[in-house]
Amino acid sequence: MTTLPETKACKVNIENEWLTISFNQPEKRNALTSELTDDIKNIFDAARDDLGVRGVTMRGEGGIFCAGGDLKMFKTGFQGGEQGMKDVEEASALTGAFFDMINSYPKPVVMLAEGAAMAGGLGMLCAGDIVVVTEDCKFALTETTHGCLLYTSDAADEEDSVDLGGRRII
């Protein structure tokens, strides 16, 4: 069996040939921080060819699946004027590639959600092969309130924001 990598933002467990990844940043509402996405990518890479792992379950700790993107990074990086449109497009493309990695994984990926799956958290949830949610789980696509178009490599410019009726743009 492959040795799984050390993680910063996840708990990892293998039991009965099944890998469980638990997002373990409830104080950040299990946001898609760079630490969390790096952990998930590294775990998926390590388990990809491991015959001792037949499938993967992903879930959130602390009563929430995932609140989406890391808004602290978003506000300082993208809305702080330090990065341009190209940087926003690259970040969006990386997010899309992350979802594609989950969706195209060669083993079944089961998503278990409770609490909320918001923005990129909902995108990640939809990338799974099987999705199970609690009856009271909340869902929302809130990217447009931050000037981003949904799961594309684009961000809204001034002209687009007028078309979308937006008030804030990147």
Walk through the language-model features, giving the residues of each:
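Conserved CoA-thioester-binding segment of acyl-CoA-metabolizing enzymes
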Residues: 1-61
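Beta-strand-connecting loop/turn residues
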Residues: 16-17, 63, 137, 167
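Charged catalytic carboxylate motif
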Residues: 35-39, 94, 101
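Hydrophobic/aromatic residues within transmembrane alpha-helices
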Residues: 58, 70, 124-126
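Glycine- (often His-adjacent) and acidic-residue-rich active-site loop
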Residues: 60-98, 117
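Glycine-rich beta-to-alpha active-site loop
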Residues: 96-147
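Conserved small/polar residues in nucleotide/adenosyl-binding loops
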Residues: 151-160
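Hydrophobic alpha-helical segments, chiefly the membrane-spanning helices
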Residues: 163-170
